């Protein structure tokens, strides 16, 4: 059950570098995920909340409520909305920082805790336990519903503009980004960071992005690493060909020297130049497709 998940996510944590003290701290994520909620090392980007309204909120969902992190400009209104979809490690400090980066660009950014019902991954010390007890038990249908609820809440409670809705996600959230673009017909655009494109279907997670190409309405920009050991380039090229054959306006960019999680500045897989280029491409994609002026 675990094999289909472990390669890209865990390999990107461990890497193959010589272990300095900082790198030992980074790789300890494999046995203690509490570290993922705090900045690690000089490469970690920290975005302040000056001029922002930022913090934890509660989102009403179909069966109650779930926690989320929300960041938006402190002044103004009618903000474009971006749903920020977590990595497998939940809504930790890196994901919150990404929300603040978007807020500095004028967005209302929301990262809902999509594992809230299944467990708190920051308190689980073993990665196999995370996959077995949490990730594998999160239904795609529930995730789609929660993202819809987060978007609706942003409109109602955070001055969000329902006509300018975007989504972006990383790793586990990259796959979700593609699926959400096939789910929500009101979505303006999406950016999927190294989300798995093909995989073994399960009852709770029945489809992968390659399976839903025909249903993708919103333009999605896929950002992938040419050295990703968990997402074969053959899969990336197959997805690109399928999008073209279906006459979709989505695009895929491959960074030749990057591996999995090249945007994650708290992990040894981080590549500053590719991360910066990917971020610029993400913002430009949203501008191009009318999320922001």
What do the predicted segments below correspond to?
Residues 43-74:
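N-terminal cap/lid segment of alpha/beta-hydrolase-fold proteins
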Residues 78-87:
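Short beta-strand element of the alpha/beta-hydrolase
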């Amino acid at each position: 059950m675990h094999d289909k998940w472990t390669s890209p996510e865990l390999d990107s944590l461990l890497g193959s570098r010589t272990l300095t003290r900082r790198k030992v701290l980074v790789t300890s994520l494999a046995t203690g995920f509490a570290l993922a909620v705090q900045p690690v090392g000089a490469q970690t980007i920290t975005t302040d909340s000056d001029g922002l309204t930022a913090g934890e909120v509660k989102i009403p969902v179909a069966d109650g409520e779930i926690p989320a992190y929300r960041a938006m400009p402190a002044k103004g209104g009618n903000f474009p909305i971006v749903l920020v979809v977590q990595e497998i490690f939940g809504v930790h400090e890196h994901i919150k920082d990404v929300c603040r980066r978007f807020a500095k660009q004028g967005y209302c950014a929301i990262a809902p805790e999509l594992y809230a019902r299944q467990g708190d991954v920051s308190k689980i010390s073993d990665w196999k336990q995370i996959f077995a007890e949490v990730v594998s038990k999160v239904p795609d249908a529930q995730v789609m519903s929660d993202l819809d609820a987060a978007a609706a809440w942003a409109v109602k409670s955070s001055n969000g503009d329902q006509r300018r809705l975007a989504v972006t996600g990383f790793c586990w959230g990259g796959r979700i980004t593609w699926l959400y673009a096939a789910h929500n017909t009101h979505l303006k655009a999406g950016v999927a960071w190294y989300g798995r494109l093909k995989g073994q279907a399960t009852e709770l997670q029945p489809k992968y992005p390659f399976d839903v190409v025909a249903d993708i309405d919103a333009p999605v920009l896929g950002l992938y690493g040419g050295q990703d050991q968990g997402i074969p380039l053959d899969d990336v090229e197959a997805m690109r060909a399928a999008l073209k054959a279906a006459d979709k306006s989505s695009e895929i960019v491959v960074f030749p020297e990057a591996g999995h999680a090249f945007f994650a500045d708290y992990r040894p897989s981080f590549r500053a130049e590719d991360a910066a280029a990917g971020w610029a491409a993400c913002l430009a994609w949203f501008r191009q497709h009318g999320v922001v002026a």
